Amino acid sequence: MQRVLRAAAAGIGHASGHRAPRWGAAAAAARWLSGGREAMSYDVVVVGAGPAGLAAAIRLKQLCRDADTDLSVCVLEKGSEVGAHVLSGNVFEPRALDELIPKWRQEDTPIRVPVSSDKFWLLTKNKAWTLPSPFDNKGNYVISLSQMVRWMASKAEELGVEVYPGFAASEILYDENQIVTGVATNDVGIAKDGSKRETFQPGVELRGRMTLLAEGCRGSLSEKIIRNHKLRESGQGQHQTYALGIKEVWEIEEGKHKPGSVIHTVGWPLDSKTYGGSFMYHLDDRQLAIGLVVALNYQNPFMSPYDEFQKFKQHPAVRTILDGGTVLQYGARTLNEGGFQSIPNPVFPGGAIIGCSAGFLNVPKIKGTHTAMKSGMLAAEATFKTLVEGSSMELYWENLKKSWIWEELYRARNYRPAFEYGFIPGIALSALERYVFKGKSPFTLKHGIPDHEATDMASLHSPIQYPKPDGQISFDVPTSLYRSSTNHEHDQPPHLRLRDPTVPERVNLPLYAGPESHYCPARVYEYVTDEKGDQKLHINAQNCLHCKACDIKDPKQNIEWTVPEGGGGPGYTVM
């Protein structure tokens, strides 16, 4: 508990105006001295200060205000401040925000660059062919999602929500009937060897009558809940599929900057068997968001999404935009692509899963912020009715299936699995779905095998020789990592855990050429030669961007991503 007070005093989240926790110092000290964990009670505990979690918190407090009642609501965020771990494209569709805060356009918000043009390119190695754009971005905005959630956090606090950045929820709390009763943050001040350092502080229990998990894609607690309660099976039934998005924000030359310009591409540098594409979005202040998204069911274990992104930037049509510019920030994050077929039942005893932890991304739109926010709002409404009016959280699941989220994702359900048949068949099936069936086709395609099973043996492929970075347009990983402001306490237990420590050298390296050393966009995993001349896996956990790619793509599902000490990880400000 003293850690909580000390963190607040040190100004964690101070830039966003977050208040110090209102917990009793005397009682906290007594429990700390006795070795116990401080436990605080709220009506609702929200894990994750992203668009879904904050939309849920805001909606709850709005309902309380309208009903002249009150529910205590807290939001935990593992990043050092709100937005520090949030990364997205982002062309923002304001539909959910219009419902949540109808007069937002009259306020000073970071949502200020409307889409002005929308282009779609097919890239070959040296050419960019303009195709009809399949996107309808009229009325949408080019934004930094990390900036938007900071604004949302301030709106939540105005309504009385307590927002606590720098605290990582690491444990689900249950009662004797196996009903979730909240979460606990991890202990800090534990050394790599498991001993307690002088700075040791026990974690804090945040107990709630209702717990909403809004951890984002592949949330560690959410995945445990989904497995333990078989929520995938009681939902739409199919496994989730994923992609890895790698992004930079540049400051480009004034003459090349076109605020609101949106460009998407498909084709080069990815091969015809790999689903993915790139984006370039012009924000304000001469800023350009540029990124590459690669589906994680790719086959070639030698592929490096990071190096594919560096190669993409060297395309003549792309380089001409970047020349003379400067990189401001770098980051990476996985995203859900399973869509309608992969939606789990989001309700569990004592709470619900919202946002990208459940997986509401609309793949053909390349948008998930509006659906994440709406899911949080629906969960908040069900939570309010459950706690105040005696209803049931099943109302969230019922209303979700009646909402525009469900309609949107149903119409979009066949686009992603269409590309299981290859690039050209995927384009053809997508065109059929869009222009002929208009999302109402009489069939529903299934996803292929899970992403980790899609990785081929290395013997079926040749190593890929990527160009060396030039230091102007393309960069090595250490340079990019520095731009992510990633930082972790070095002397702490590893948060990247191997279920079987022999698998990397026994299976991954000889059979798959050590794919973790290729897919990780932060070079966390490296095979190094020991004094005996043997190759051993070395884990640079301090480099971790919290993207979750390893938790998804490892061929034998041997890597478990868990939360490190709160406040560690990337420090995004404009992503």
Curated annotation (Swiss-Prot):
GO cellular component annotations of the record:
mitochondrial inner membrane
Which keywords label this protein?
Electron transport, FAD, Flavoprotein, Iron, Iron-sulfur, Membrane, Metal-binding, Mitochondrion, Mitochondrion inner membrane, Oxidoreductase, Transit peptide, Transport, Ubiquinone
Q: Which residue range or ranges hold the 4Fe-4S ferredoxin-type domain?
A: 535-564
Cofactor comment text: Binds 1 [4Fe-4S] cluster.
Q: Which residues lie within the membrane without crossing it?
A: 82-103, 343-363
**Catalytic reaction list:** a ubiquinone + reduced [electron-transfer flavoprotein] = a ubiquinol + oxidized [electron-transfer flavoprotein] + H(+)
Q: What class of enzyme is it?
A: oxidoreductase
Q: Report the main location listed first in the record.
A: mitochondrion
Q: What is this protein called?
A: Electron transfer flavoprotein-ubiquinone oxidoreductase, mitochondrial
